A protein has these predicted regions:
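A short, well-structured juxtamembrane/interface segment
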Residues: 63-83
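Catalytic core of membrane glycerolipid acyltransferases/transacylases, capturing the structured
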Residues: 32-62, 83-159, 169-186
């Protein structure tokens, strides 16, 4: 089996880094500098822009993810999904932390998402900014996350893999309210056009409990919303039940409901009428699964606000 180029480059950089550093520093410092040099090829590699990404099956399916999950998550399917079929999953709400997306990525649910759609047959889109964070980017790449650019999304679907998108994006994230149900979708039609261009069925997904995990703060919210629009970087401020551990969520359960797949007819250049038609079907199905399950997983009088 061929050794990936990035590993060869990392080994070369490590040896060169240590050799050069030894001329100026003691061995421990030289090793540290060598390790930093060895990491550079991985950090600079454009792996996130490839549909293949850096998916590592062993890492992505570790039982540790579910064992350490602080809240239980259950997946519910209106229709059984076929492992060999390609889907575009549009998951909502984003929430302040997109917790349910992390659960999908790691399989920390019952059943595990990778038992439904295997990890090597799907990719998840992640904001470009996260791939600029050292080490964290590698963790995401190993879990099957790639850059949320249009070209990458096209290449993933063209390869036959399924795709998971948080369509609401930063806007939906910044609109998150504790125990409220907002989705930012009326103007979001690009994912529908993308699915039609590849003839891929769209699956609406709603995660009850996502907006119950943390209490978002409205502190400087207008400024943070402006910053998010200007620089495409969200700055969520939220807390859990304890002030000394703000990263611990409230003890709630997440119930992630998958609606009926919405079929599309492949067309390289779909008309706006066709995009609107499929978009309308998507909104209707998302509303249907919300209304059907809200009494069991939220409250009977809960309402879904589509913005």
């Amino acid at each position: 089996m061929a050794i990936p180029t990035v590993y060869v480059a990392s080994l070369s950089a490590f040896v060169a880094g240590v050799a050069i550093s030894l001329q100026y520093y003691a061995l421990p410092y030289a090793v540290v500098l060598g390790l930093l040099a060895a990491y550079l090829p991985s950090f600079l590699a454009p792996t996130q822009f490839s549909q293949r990404g850096g998916y590592w099956p062993w890492f992505a399916t570790l039982s540790l993810w579910k064992a350490r999950a602080p809240v239980p998550t259950t997946l519910h399917f209106e229709t059984p999904l076929a492992k060999e079929t390609q889907y575009l999953f549009s998951s909502h709400p984003h929430g302040p932390t997109s917790w349910h997306h992390g659960v999908m990525i790691t399989g920390a649910s019952t059943p595990a998402f990778h038992d439904v759609i295997p990890g090597d047959r799907r990719r998840h889109l992640g904001a470009s900014i996260v791939f600029r964070i050292p080490i964290y980017r590698e963790l995401l790449l190993w879990l099957g996350v790639v850059d949320a650019s249009r070209s990458v999304a096209h290449s993933v679907l063209a390869s036959g893999k399924s795709l998971v998108i948080l369509v609401g994006g930063i806007q939906e994230q910044m609109l998150a309210e504790y125990q409220k149900h907002h989705v930012f979708l009326h103007s979001r039609k690009g994912f529908v056009k993308l699915a039609i261009q590849h003839g891929t069925a769209i699956v609406p997904v709603y995660a009850f409990g996502e907006n119950d995990l943390f209490r978002p703060s409205t502190f400087l919210l207008p400024l943070r919303q402006w910053f998010a629009r200007k620089f495409l970087i969200a700055i969520p401020l939220c807390v859990g039940p304890t002030w000394w551990n703000p990263f611990k969520p409230f003890p709630v359960e997440i119930h992630q409901v998958y609606g009926h797949p919405i079929p599309t007819t492949k067309c390289d250049n779909p008309s706006s009428d066709e995009v609107d038609r499929v978009h309308g079907l998507f909104l209707t199905e998302l509303q249907r699964i919300f209304d059907k399950h809200k009494a069991a997983y939220a409250t009977p009088d809960a309402t879904l606000e589509i913005l």
